[in-house]
């Protein structure tokens, strides 16, 4: 009897050990696949979900740890949210200051505590601006250079989103900051609402724009819908969250992730030779030939930034000073 019990114990231990080995091998396979996911997806974030909620959903679905987004959209807003996978997270800083494009609607005659439809009504009137007044006000709006973010915005205060603090009733102040409105156009006007398109610098808050425009027109207004339609020069072909999650497996994800360098302009690209790649990998600047430099488009917008690659092994973001290329971000793609 004792012998039988010992035999059963050994058999159980053997099964557990084999299961562990299978699990470990499966984990290694998953990790190898994870290491291959280095690139970008441009997500159409649904309204009602925070940017971080979406990120955590993707992490859990595909068992990915290294993941990030750029250009936070608060829960009310929907639209363009760039997601960086793996080593692409090292390039987030190069696009976070890109201009943004939005479509949004204002409902006239009502002021809410949050600047949108979720807040409590704090004031009302019956003034509905006419088309002529709106168009005249938009011309003035384009000249605004400083803006105080709305308390129900995604602006961070000591690491906490302003809208989270505001919902908890925390008293705080936000400082005015520089903005640049490149375009501000009326797209549609109905009885008590209007839809607008705006193209503006990073850090422009649409709720604040809507309230400023309403005040300029002698009325109240709140944002009833907000959709980001553009992000710098990035491709505007987006994938919905439902479509992304329906892929189920990381191998399917790998097939649709955009290349790591897709967030950079195509003008200033350089294919490296082996010896130059070795130097840049070690952080050593290299000198370029004049004929190579002639092919580059260098101006204030490019910031003399050069994207250099060696096969599919090395990706470098560098700054060109005269003939010398200084590596700023070096990404080893071999593992």
For the regions a language model picked out, list residue spans one by one.
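Accessory RNA 3′-end/elbow-binding domains used by RNA modification enzymes
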Residues: 2-46, 52-73, 77-80, 98, ...
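The conserved catalytic core of RNA pseudouridine synthases
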Residues: 58-64, 82, 171-203, 207-218
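Residue-level signal for inorganic ion chemistry
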Residues: 83, 104, 159, 209, ...
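Short, charged/polar surface micro-motifs in flexible loops or helix N-caps
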Residues: 86-90, 111
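Acidic, low-complexity central loop/insert segments
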Residues: 94-149
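A structural signal for short, well-ordered beta-strand segments
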Residues: 104-106, 184, 196, 226, ...
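Short, structured patches in soluble enzyme cores that scaffold and shape functional sites
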Residues: 106-108, 156, 167, 188, ...
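Extended alpha-helical targeting/anchoring segments
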Residues: 153, 157-176, 180-182
